[in-house]
A protein has these predicted regions:
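Immediate post-signal peptide segment of exported/extracytoplasmic ligand-binding proteins
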Residues: 21-31, 143-151, 317-319, 326
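Short, polar/charged alpha-helical segment
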Residues: 38-56, 169-172
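Ligand-binding pocket segment of bilobal, Venus flytrap-like solute-binding proteins
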Residues: 70-72, 78-83, 155-236
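A conserved helix-loop-strand patch within extracytoplasmic ligand-binding domains
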Residues: 101-156
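A bilobed periplasmic-binding-protein/Venus flytrap-type ligand-binding module shared by bacterial periplasmic
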Residues: 114-125, 257-269, 292-293
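C-terminal lobe and pocket-closing loops
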Residues: 218-281
Length: 332
């Protein structure tokens, strides 16, 4: 019996040492908690998995794209920016990578952040010939202007948004006015969302600007229209994104790269935790649905993370080893 107890205690001690070694290897880690829903829930997913699966002492800290990434380069903190919109400040990110201050981990949003013109899925189901912007412009009767049903309507975002400028320029480039469409200023984010919700609930036609990932696209099934032309980045910068450019051309809307960024100092000491950060990625569809659940349930990032981990085991267990997966599942 004494021998059994001694063996048991030794095994427990070795397990404890292994756990302590893992925690010591990972150590304290700070994770930027950005101030929008998709980034907030991803930060909470990372915190839970790093804490419960890898024994890290993980902490969320307030963050935003520009100050967080700048601080990571200049001060070496926070350790992780889970949802880094790297295309918003390419020069800063490239400097951090070239100077050895930053390490690029997984592309967090595997299909990229998406902007463009969307229509309800029920419109496409009923009219399978509608695939592109030009296809929509042949069917103004399917997208009536609320103020003048003899015309079609394209719903734009509020003034001040980059997407609003681009939509205005694409409206010109595709000859939408000549096709009988008006460009509707929705006035605010709430106005834009409300126009989609109203159309969807009445099963009416709607076409206009939106983006992913968003909770609204998790609630309402929408289809992004193809632009019918290849992307031309030089032309995009010259005119499609410039409000007073007089001669915009048809163009494809580029996707934004959303990547997890890690400080070099943390990457060097993270051990197995870095393997997770190099692997963890999800799609717009997954995030849209999760954000819709969070919005409907007024859930926090932490609550959203636990819901995701409970409901999407087939996905997140691919990001970690079987041993880590068991630890995470036991903590839920």
């Amino acid at each position: 019996m004494k021998k059994f107890l001694a063996t048991t205690c030794l095994a427990a001690g070795l397990l404890g040492l292994g756990s302590a070694a893992s925690a010591a290897e990972c150590g304290d880690v700070t994770i930027a908690n950005m101030n929008w829903q998709s980034a907030e829930v991803l930060a909470s997913v990372d915190k839970f998995i790093l804490t419960e699966g890898y024994g890290c002492d993980a902490e969320l800290v307030v963050g935003d794209t520009v100050p967080t990434i700048t601080s990571m380069i200049e001060k070496g903190e926070p350790d992780i920016a889970p949802e880094g919109w790297v295309d918003l400040l390419p020069d800063v990110v490239n400097r951090g990578l070239q100077e050895g201050k930053l390490v690029g981990a997984a592309v967090a949003l595997s299909d990229g952040a998406v902007q463009g013109w969307w229509v309800p899925k029920y419109i496409v189901d009923a009219n399978p010939d509608i695939k592109t912007i030009d296809d929509v412009l042949k069917h103004k009767e399917l997208f009536p202007d609320p103020e003048d049903p003899s015309k079609g309507a394209i719903f734009n975002g509020p003034q001040g948004w980059g997407g609003t400028v681009v939509t205005t320029q694409l409206y010109k480039a595709y000859g939408a006015e000549a096709a009988g469409f008006t460009l509707v200023d929705t006035g605010s984010a709430a106005g834009l969302d409300g126009s989609i919700a109203k159309a969807y609930e009445r099963k009416q036609g709607w076409v206009g600007y939106y983006w992913a990932p968003t909770a609204l696209l998790g609630k309402y099934e929408m289809v992004k229209l193809e632009h019918g032309v290849p992307g031309d980045m030089a032309e995009w910068k010259r005119c499609n994104t410039v409000a007073d450019c007089p001669d915009p051309k048809k163009n494809d809307w580029p996707k934004d790269k959303v990547q997890t960024l890690v400080t070099k100092t943390f990457a060097d000491r993270a051990g197995p935790a870095m393997e997770y950060l190099n692997t963890r990625a999800w799609t717009n569809d997954t995030v849209n649905k999760l954000m819709a659940w969070m919005t409907d349930n007024q859930a926090s990032g932490e609550e959203g993370a636990k819901h995701f981990l409970e409901e999407n085991e087939d996905l997140w267990t691919k990001w970690v080893s079987p041993e880590v997966a068991e630890k995470v599942k036991a903590a839920l």
